[in-house]
């Protein structure tokens, strides 16, 4: 029960902040696209799921580095939901950039290897966000 209370308090505090609508929107976009892939919602490690050799743009590398930082965070003892949500807030531009017309990538590309790799990248972001809440269900 303490864990649930902690999550609720973190979400309430987050929703009262300035960036909440932007972050909810971008994580919802990640989630909707990630759901088109087949990576399970219980996968948090990039190893064997993401092939960095397939990255074509810096935006993919940046999201990958963000995931590495999240992995390091949740692998520490006593990490808190507030730390996780703060990391998402601090990296909102990284999350947005992957969809940018010039600097981003086409996730649903015809190349199936690239598509799977990109969907897995988005899915792992989704999975970390689900540790806090399903952002597609958060209302303003």
Task: List the model feature ranges, each with a label.
Residues 1-140:
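Amphipathic alpha-helical "coupling" segments that flank catalytic cores
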């Amino acid at each position: 029960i303490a864990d649930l209370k902690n999550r609720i308090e973190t979400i309430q505090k987050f929703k009262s902040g300035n960036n909440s609508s932007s972050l909810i929107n971008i994580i919802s976009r990640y989630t909707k696209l990630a759901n088109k892939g087949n990576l399970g919602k219980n996968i948090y490690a990039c190893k064997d799921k993401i092939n960095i050799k397939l990255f074509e743009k810096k935006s993919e590398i940046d999201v990958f580095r963000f995931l590495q930082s999240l992995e390091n965070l949740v692998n520490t003892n006593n990490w808190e939901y507030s730390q996780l949500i703060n990391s998402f807030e601090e990296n909102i531009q990284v999350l947005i950039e992957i969809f940018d017309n010039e600097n981003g990538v086409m996730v649903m590309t015809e190349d199936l290897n690239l598509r799977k790799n990109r969907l897995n990248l988005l899915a792992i972001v989704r999975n970390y966000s689900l540790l806090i809440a399903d952002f597609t269900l958060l209302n303003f």
